[in-house]
Amino acid sequence: MGAFRFHQYQVVGRALPTEKDVQPKIYRMKLWATNEVRAKSKFWYFLRKLKKVKKSNGQMLAINEIYEKNPTTIKNFGIWLRYQSRTGYHNMYKEYRDTTLNGAVEQMYTEMASRHRVRFPCIQIIKTATVPAKLCKRESTKQFHNSKIKFPLVFRKVRPPSRKLKTTYKANKPNLFM
């Protein structure tokens, strides 16, 4: 969707064929980036670390953006991640409620930046999954599973009963709080 900063991409690549290895192993990775160029860059970064395949002797086979199947239904998403802080590397599990996985990932990046001061390059998403309501662990997501949930009415704005009684300028400021 156009509204999200991060998009999910599926990147497929391999090492260049050589005489020793005519058909090199193909690697597929799903990752989040702001655009295709950054997705490719992230793919080669991880492939260099995991499988010793560099971009200079590698080949990009395909790159496609992955879209949400049902972007209008609310789901619980679990995100397993690894991040680098000032003290070292940490593993973490986070839960979010959103309509799309991209929205949940965006929430995760925002929360990690605010709570832990960890920016986008220092975060590695290991795994994501749609979590059923009974398997949710975090209280922040469980609180919305109640079908009889009520939200407080913080303030009430009194509107005129007809357009004829609507005025541009009021004699006194309305009191909105109860």
Curated annotation (Swiss-Prot):
GO terms for biological process: embryo development ending in seed dormancy; pollen tube growth; translation. One of its GO terms (cellular component) is plant-type vacuole. This is Large ribosomal subunit protein eL20y. Belongs to the eukaryotic ribosomal protein eL20 family. It comes from the Eukaryota. The keyword Signal does not apply. Keywords: Ribonucleoprotein, Ribosomal protein.
